[in-house]
Curated annotation (Swiss-Prot):
Skewed-composition ranges (Basic residues): 313-329
Native species: Dictyostelium discoideum (Social amoeba)
UniProt gene name: sepA
Domain Protein kinase: 18-268
Protein's name according to its UniProt entry: Serine/threonine-protein kinase sepA
Entry keyword annotation includes Nucleotide-binding: yes
Compartmental location: Cytoplasm, Cytoskeleton, Microtubule organizing center, Centrosome
Length: 1167
């Protein structure tokens, strides 16, 4: 056993031939002492168990078990030596392991690295394989039960008999909770697969210092083990270890692999094949030998300490000096460009800021900020440092230029002016000079492509801000950019113009050949630009027509006109003062009729002026206004439309006058009257709202709201105007939010204001919560959610409209599509106290009847929303002051509403943090009666939710099991089971668990519990649970229970169960059956005198050694109680059968058990 600091010394205490020494361990079952064999001087560990903790009928079985276990012998298990029984205690003598347990090493030196864990777990598995081959289930594998020697070898301790002492408890849950397998928690019996789960938990314990769920209490941890699909795995583990752990943590024990197969896993095999690592490299390799076995314990301890120091050491944030020379400030070294295909689709939408055009012999390059010369004329008089920097600098980005202009035949040029606008803006940011005397001719570029994408920090249009950046000095750029576009098949001529981006309103030259020049350059170099086609949604851009020579005026107009498409007529764009960002949003409106006429006249005058410069070559009789008006333009002169426009203008003027009256200087009657008239006008002409905001904005209204001595009825009138203005207008709402409208209006929500003012405030808030994501986020940012909760606190009878509006607003918060997760809204509302208020509103709205018909459903849907939130919200909702009013309303709800509320309670019960609150609120008492409904709407849903809730509440907790029993759940459970309802999967585990609660058994007696359990023996998947319930029950109330079992009919049920049990459940029924046979003599005799022994003999060839061992134990027990043991031996010819097992069985324990049984048989036959 493990070695610890001396706690207590036993003086002059001798047990057999052993002296008791210091206490080296304590547990719930007893105390462990270091002992000294006074005959040979060997040190041993002696476990002392008080006889009062062992039932008298089980003492002999435990001593017999020790006699069996002392035959086990393996390097990786602690050896049982003997037992000594005194008047008061039972002493078990064990092998002494001097270096303590792995859990003690963790506490002393820190958590283990993965490589060392692998070395130790390999030995654990080897010891476990041996135990399982002998038919022994450890049941309590953990770090404290894995002991180490000074050589670093490990040994498994506390197996077999140690767990028998815990079997005496009524619950019969064996093992330590955090390492316990789910099937043990659910009382389905322990198997060898249960040990595999515990090994996985032990690995996590060694890696992290604690087992899974160690941060929880024992009961919550048990709940999570059963509830979760898999325990949380440590971060940073290797993929092989992760796969290994997933094999251990299969929830279904039948899918869990054996210890033998785990030894063959690649994670374990790596520790065997791993070669020793040099000292100091890796930290752990030098703690193992060449085969992966542990070295001296001192070396291992040192390595563990070093490993923990490294993982706990804070990383240094000091920057190391760079081996590369530091780049000069202002220089940007770009990576080498990649070759690109001649793909022209996106070149002008993604254009770099800096463009340098070299001479005609060199390709266009994108250079750094500093001026540069053409590639072939680069000076070489740089300093060595500069040369080194230039060598390290990647080559500049190149702008590829086609040698020949590309001619496009695409007549669709709707996007051309968009690109011209962007390029003109870009060229406005270039500073051209004339430093070079020999300039090459300007290239005629159709579509320049760039070999590198633009910087992500560029402006939206892909260019700079137009000369404001001091770093963008392009004084040495020798070449201009020129565009030679083809706007359409009917465009002819060659004109010149310029686009200047220094002004706020950019203009673009309106000629077939557009050129860009720099006004600051003495020798303007024109840049031919190739415009691109804008998308169909873009707004037309402004274009200045040229004044150079052209054809006749009629031809000029034809060149720029569109046939039959007034929307695509570019003649009216020249006067539009636009912003590219505004254009992109599509907010530039179409000019009215007068503007279009002015544009057409101006264009015609220019065309006429140009015709006089054509030396009389044009046709003087041509009507230059022939195409100015089409027949469709007659609609603009419609009398009705003009009357409507006049009426609109008068109304606009009236609204502006009324708005001017909304000032603090005006009398209150005037302000109220103005507000009333404004509301009427806005209802009749909603488009006037936009005009109002554009001309006056919302500031005048905001100023009125800030008046301190304003009367409540005036305030109410102003709020009505605000609500009318923002109604169904998202733009105005957002503008109002941006100028602080939300906090200015929210202050009127307090109970000190009249109900009318609060109602208008609630209307405003409701609109803010339901229109757009932006207004909702602003409302929340202004801490508006508590306001909604305050509205709900208003007296329902007096302010029901206010309460309803608050409920609507809360629902809108959850229904509006928002990037904020709904769980965050639940957390915020929960923090504001909403959950305490909603149940009261639900009660009042139910009592209100038809007047509030829809609001109970809305509130119930909110309950479902909150019950599905995170653990913090669920725990708040499960508070007694919240859940109790909800439970009180259950009987008043309609069936559909009841099903929804029960669903929300079920979702709460799935969180272990809520179970105690639900119990204290009386959830079991309120919900159990609903199981009695047999007909009606939504009955199946109601039963499902209630049984699920009871399943979570009663699981593992005897106190709640008893509460459910006295509240009458047993008859309902029996109904669902006997009627073969789909819900019996929840009813069966509940009723089987009730037998483990001593208090609940009194209710089971009232409902024929023993007979019901016997009937469950026919249920294929619940045979083990039902038989285990009988075994637990007969232990405490032997006489009453055995009187029911010990009948011929029920004995036949037991034999039939034994005969027909499938292989998966057969191993599970043997232990509870053995317990019943050992405890109840009448049952034992009835089975022993029947053909049951024949059935046992047929099963003795089972492959599982644990099954064979339990079968031999059953034969032994039947033999000891048989009224005619000699006849039994002869009748069933047991001696040769047992002799064969004793001679040939591979399990040491099975052989030993058979040998002892054979000795008893031979002694009886001799007698």
């Amino acid at each position: 056993m493990s070695k610890k600091e001396p706690e207590e010394i036993k003086k002059n205490v001798t047990v057999g031939n052993y002296n008791l020494g210091v206490v080296i361990g304590k547990g719930g079952f007893g105390t462990v002492y270091q002992g000294l064999d006074i005959e040979d001087g060997d040190f041993v560990a002696i476990k002392q168990i008080n006889l009062t903790k062992i039932p008298k009928d089980q003492l002999q079985g435990i001593m017999n078990e020790i006699d069996l276990l002392k035959n086990l012998n393996h390097a990786n298990i602690v050896k049982y030596i003997k037992y000594v029984k005194t008047k008061d205690n039972l002493y078990i003598v064990l092998e002494y392991v001097e270096n303590g347990s792995l859990s003690g090493i963790i506490k002393k030196f820190g958590k283990f690295p993965e490589t060392l864990v692998c070395v130790y777990i390999r030995q654990v598995l080897e010891g476990l394989v041996y135990l399982h081959e002998q038919g022994v289930v450890h049941r309590d594998i953990k770090g404290a039960n894995i002991l180490t020697t000074k050589e670093g070898k490990i040994k498994l301790a506390d197996f077999g008999v140690a767990t028998k002492f815990d079997d005496t408890s009524a619950a019969a849950v064996v093992g330590t909770p955090y390492w316990m397998a789910p099937e043990i928690i659910e009382l389905n019996g322990a198997t060898t697969k249960s040990d595999i789960w515990s090994v996985g938990c032990t690995v996590i314990e060694l890696l992290t210092g604690s087992p899974p769920y160690y941060d929880l209490g024992q009961m919550p941890a048990l709940f999570r083990i059963v509830q979760d699909d898999c325990p949380p795995l440590p971060e940073g583990i290797s993929p092989p270890l992760k796969d290994w752990l997933m094999q251990c943590f299969q929830k279904d024990p039948n899918l869990r692999i054996s210890a033998q197969k785990l030894l063959k896993h690649k994670w374990i095999q790596a520790s065997i094949k791993k070669k020793p690592v040099e000292n100091g490299a890796g930290g752990v390799g030098n703690g193992t030998d060449s085969l992966g076995a542990p070295a001296n314990i001192d070396d291992i301890a040192k390595n563990i300490t070093d490993y923990n120091e490294r993982i706990n050491k804070k990383p240094s944030h000091q920057r190391k000096p760079s081996i590369h020379p530091k780049s000069p400030k202002g220089k940007v070294f770009l990576p080498p460009p990649e070759e690109e295909e001649d793909e022209w689709g996106d070149d002008f939408s993604n254009t770099p800021k800096s463009i340098k055009l070299p001479d005609k012999k060199s390709p266009l390059k994108l250079t750094n900020n500093k001026p540069s010369t053409p590639l072939k004329q680069q000076p070489t008089n740089n300093t060595p440092v500069q040369q080194q920097q230039q060598q390290q600098q990647p080559p500049p980005l190149k702008l590829a230029v086609p040698k020949q202009p590309v001619i496009e035949n695409d007549d669709d040029w709707g996007d051309d002016f968009n690109t011209v606008s962007d390029l003109s803006k870009a060229v406005g940011s270039l500073n051209f000079n004339n430093n070079k005397k020999n300039e090459t001719p300007k290239p005629n570029i159709k579509k320049p492509t760039f070999s590198e994408d633009e910087d992500e920090d560029d402006d939206d249009d892909g260019f700079g801000s137009g000369g404001d950046d001091e770093d963008d000095d392009f004084g040495d750029i020798p070449t201009s950019i020129k565009l030679n576009p083809k706007f359409g098949s009917n465009i002819k001529g060659n004109s010149s113009g310029s686009a200047n981006t220094t002004n706020s309103s950019s203009t673009v030259v309106q000629q077939p050949k557009l050129t860009v020049s720099n006004n600051n350059n003495n020798n303007n170099k024109k840049l031919p630009l190739s415009p691109r086609q804008p998308s169909s949604g873009n707004v037309k851009e402004g274009i200045n027509h040229g004044s150079t020579g052209s054809k006749s005026g009629g031809v000029i107009i034809d060149q720029w006109g569109e046939d039959g498409e007034e929307d695509n007529d570019w003649g009216d764009v020249a006067t539009v003062n636009f912003d590219p960002k505004v254009i992109r949003k599509g907010t530039v409106n179409k000019p009215d009729l007068s503007t279009r006429l002015k544009n057409r006249i101006a264009l015609s005058e220019t065309a006429l002026s140009n015709s006089f410069n054509n030396n009389g070559n044009d046709d003087e009789d041509e009507d230059i206004f022939a195409d100015d008006f089409d027949e469709d333009d007659d609609e603009d002169f419609d009398l009705d439309k003009n009357l409507m426009k006049d009426n609109y203008a008068r109304m606009s003027s009236e609204i502006l006058k009324l708005m001017n009256l909304l000032t603090p200087e005006q009398p209150e009657e005037v302000i109220s009257s103005a507000c009333t008239q404004l509301i009427t006008m806005f209802k009749e002409n909603s488009e006037q709202k936009t005009l109002l905001i554009r001309r006056h904005g919302v500031i005048p209204i905001m100023e009125m709201l800030e008046v301190s001595n304003i009367q409540s009825h005036v305030l109410c009138s102003i709020l009505k105007v605000v609500n009318q203005i923002i109604d169904n207008n998202m733009e105005i709402q957002e503008n109002l939010c941006l100028v602080g409208g939300i906090p200015a209006i929210m202050k009127f929500s307090g109970p000190e204001y009249p109900a009318s003012v609060r109602l208008e405030t609630a209307s405003f808030i409701s609109k803010m919560c339901s229109t757009s994501t932006l207004t909702l986020q602003m409302f929340i940012a202004c801490k508006g959610l508590p306001i909604l909760v305050d509205f709900l606190l208003s007296p329902y009878a007096e302010s029901k409209r206010l309460v309803w509006m608050a409920v609507d607003a809360i629902v809108n918060v959850f229904e509006l599509q928002s990037p904020t997760p709904k769980n965050d809204f639940c957390r915020l509302f929960s923090k504001c106290g909403l959950l305490k208020t909603l149940p009261i509103v639900l009660r009042d709205s139910i009592a209100d009847g038809e007047a509030a018909a829809t609001y109970p459903d809305r509130i119930i849907n909110l309950f479902i929303m909150f019950s599905a939130a995170d653990s913090v919200v669920r725990k708040t909702m499960s508070a007694v002051e919240v859940i109790r009013p909800i439970l009180d309303t259950l009987s008043q709800l309609m069936p559909e509403q009841l099903a929804k509320v029960l669903k929300s309670i079920k979702q709460l019960s799935m969180d272990h943090n809520t179970l105690a609150n639900l119990q204290n609120a009386g959830a079991i008492r309120f919900m159990v009666p609903f199981l009695g409904r047999r007909t009606g709407a939504f009955v199946a849903e109601i039963h499902n939710h209630v049984l699920n809730t009871m399943f979570h509440l009663c699981r593992i907790d005897p106190e709640r099991q008893y509460q459910a029993a006295i509240d009458g759940i047993i008859p309902h459970l029996q109904y669902f089971i006997t009627s073969h309802s789909p819900l019996n999967q929840f009813a069966l585990p509940i009723i089987c668990d009730l037998a483990h609660s001593k208090k609940a058994r009194s209710e089971l007696w009232k409902n024929n519990g023993v007979a019901f359990y016997l009937s469950l023996l026919e249920e294929r998947y619940w045979q083990v649970n039902a038989l285990d319930s009988l075994a637990v029950w007969i232990t405490d109330e032997t006489h009453k229970v055995e009187n029911i079992i010990a009948t011929n009919e029920n004995i036949k049920k037991l034999i039939q169960l034994f005969t027909n049990a499938e292989s998966q459940s057969f191993a599970g029924i043997l232990e509870p059956l053995l317990k019943i046979i050992q405890i109840s003599i009448p049952v034992n005799i009835l089975l022993g005198t029947s053909n049951f022994i024949t059935k046992i003999i047929d099963k003795l060839g089972h492959t599982n050694p644990q099954v064979r061992l339990n079968l031999l134990k059953i034969i032994t027990s039947l033999y000891e109680c048989h009224p005619n043991a000699k006849k039994m031996i002869q009748e069933f010819k047991l001696i040769p059968i047992i002799q064969k097992i004793a001679d040939t069985d591979k399990s040491v324990l099975v052989q030993k058990m058979a040998s002892k049984l054979l000795e008893a048989f031979n002694a009886n036959t001799v007698i």
